Amino acid sequence: ASMFKHDHYMDNGVRYPNGDGICEQLNETKCDAGFSYDRSICEGPHYWHTISKWFIACGIGQRQSPINIVSYDAKFRQRLPKLKFKPHMEKLKTEVTNHQNRAPEFEPEDGENLYVKLNNLVDGHYKFHNLHVHNGRTRRKGSEHSVNGRFTPMEAHLVFHHDDQTHFEPTRTKLGGAFPGHNDFVVVGVFHEVGDDGFGDEPDDEECKRILKGHHPDNNENGNGDNGNNGYNGDNGNNGDNGNNGYNGDNGNNGDNGNNGYNGDNGNNGDNGNNGENGNNGENGNNGDNGNNGENGHKHGCRVKKAKHLSRILECAYRNDKVREFKKVGEEEGLDVHLTPEMALPPLKYRHYYTYEGSLTTPPCTESVLWVVQKCHVQVSRRVLHALRNVEGYKDGTTLRKYGTRRPTQKNKVTVYKSFK
């Protein structure tokens, strides 16, 4: 999660750690000083705290994000509210630009208002600030958060900032009172997987123009219900993209990914076979985190949604020259995009989540964030990941695939709560 438009670190020169692996603390006092995701230099994530006095929390903070969430250690809170937005399913006019070596951000235009609703947890005055998606140095490990040590190729962040115009002080969450002060931000994190089937052909330039203006097919991803009979009118309908029974794993018996859904990326003999990371007994297999008896299986009512509209929006945006080509601060060209932020989320009935008090994941690493990390995953087209990794983040044309845009896991002892048993 980010908040500021930073200078590009290359404009300030590059420093390297000394023989003892130590970087000198600079006297810089800018909160928008340049930083990098290159882990070999002093501008990289392990040394962000040395770049500016404003960044000191990156090195000594007690509630730094992201973290590895251990599901069985998370504490169930019965009264945690459902995650909703006001207004519901609102289509916003946003602008996205090249964000240099950071994830491109979709920011609402003036007058576009969307608020997150987490009744009894925070007040109702957290206003949508941006949507961005993180990627990694490898295709498989791109999410900033992990659950039980497992990552996904991408992680979407919906950032909400307390609206100063309301004249209310940000309310502190009632989650044990471990930290003093207020939470200025609410950030919703969503694990994004990638797939090949069910997302249609690659859109051409003319189709992208229509898509970015908000023109989509008549059928709605959330149309006649999450299990509707008409496929695309329900995320995983009986005759739809995800097979007869959908619920038997990621995509059901006759779905896109083989006989038993989530037994590997593409069925029983997927990327890691029956007993691999995604196999029958692995993270996403029958008894794993996302399998029939696991965290995302029958017992807890979770299912991976194919976010088809979002996929085409992201793919078209990341491919557009205004976003893809490197731009210095002040020279950006904004691309207008009509976007419904809820497209990035699971359907309402599957918005089970983990929550904890953490920080921004980019400098200045401000420790005033309430994180709401979705348990259920969303799937986008593999072309989205390819397009994002091909966005230029550096003056020499180096793309985001080289260093990624994910901060390494932070070793904090923070209490994580969950809205589900």
Curated annotation (Swiss-Prot):
It catalyses: hydrogencarbonate + H(+) = CO2 + H2O. Its EC number is 4.2.1.1. Expressed in the mantle. GO terms for molecular function: carbonate dehydratase activity; zinc ion binding. Disulfide bonds: none annotated. Sequence repeats lie at residues 225-227, 228-230, 231-233, 234-236, 237-239, 240-242, 243-245, 246-248, 249-251, 252-254, 255-257, 258-260, 261-263, 264-266, 267-269, 270-272, 273-275, 276-278, 279-281, 282-284, 285-287, 288-290, 291-292, 294-296. Residues 225-296 are annotated as: 24 X 3 AA approximate tandem repeats of G-X-N. GO terms for cellular component: extracellular region. Its cofactor is Zn(2+). Two hypotheses for calcium binding are proposed. Either the Gly-Xaa-Asn repeat domain bind calcium or sulfite and sialic acid provide the necessary negative charge in the N-glycan to promote calcium uptake. This is Nacrein-like protein M. It comes from Pinctada maxima (Silver-lipped pearl oyster).
